[in-house]
UniProtKB/Swiss-Prot annotation:
Keywords: Chloroplast, Plastid, Ribonucleoprotein, Ribosomal protein. It comes from the Eukaryota. InterPro entries: Ribosomal_Su5_D2-typ_SF, Ribosomal_uS9, Ribosomal_uS9_bac/plastid, Ribosomal_uS9_CS, Ribsml_uS5_D2-typ_fold_subgr. The gene is rps9. One of its GO terms (cellular component) is cytosolic small ribosomal subunit. It is found in: Plastid, Chloroplast. This is Small ribosomal subunit protein uS9c. Its main location: plastid.
Length: 134
């Protein structure tokens, strides 16, 4: 489905362990993630749907482009935020003038917080075993 599209703009987003490749094509506002309708993939959560389409809403282009996404890794929230970043980057390729509005809203900033590694001698990343004085 993505291969035969005439004009498409792509953007990649990362969040935690999630990676999303977003393909933007002229259309009617459809969103499709991994070949599944967006509403079904996001479990009919209005918050997830709103978050993933928020860059389009900011620019007033909700029903002008279809969004096709390949997402893998992480959980649903991480994937939604990766989709949002990828969509914002694709919109910048579409029209460089969109960059200022998207940057102002913070959609072009990659959230760099990732899981801290577990250290030896500790139970988790920071949790130490119980200390006994005697």
């Amino acid at each position: 489905m993505i291969e035969n599209l005439k004009t498409n703009y792509t953007g990649t987003g990362h969040r935690k362990q999630a990676i999303a490749r977003v393909y933007l094509t002229p259309g009617s506002g459809l969103i499709e993630v991994n070949g599944i309708k967006g509403e079904l993939y996001f479990q009919y959560s209005p918050n997830y749907i709103r978050l993933s389409k928020s860059p389009l809403t900011t620019l007033g282009l909700e029903n002008k482009y279809n969004i096709y996404v390949n997402a893998h890794g992480g959980g649903l929230t991480g994937q939604v935020e990766a989709i949002r970043l990828g969509l914002a980057r694709a919109l910048c390729k579409l029209n460089p003038e969109n960059r200022t509005a998207l940057k102002f809203e913070g959609y072009l900033t990659r959230d760099s917080r990732i899981t801290e590694r577990k250290k030896y001698g500790l139970k988790k990343a920071r949790k130490a075993p119980q200390f006994s004085k005697r």
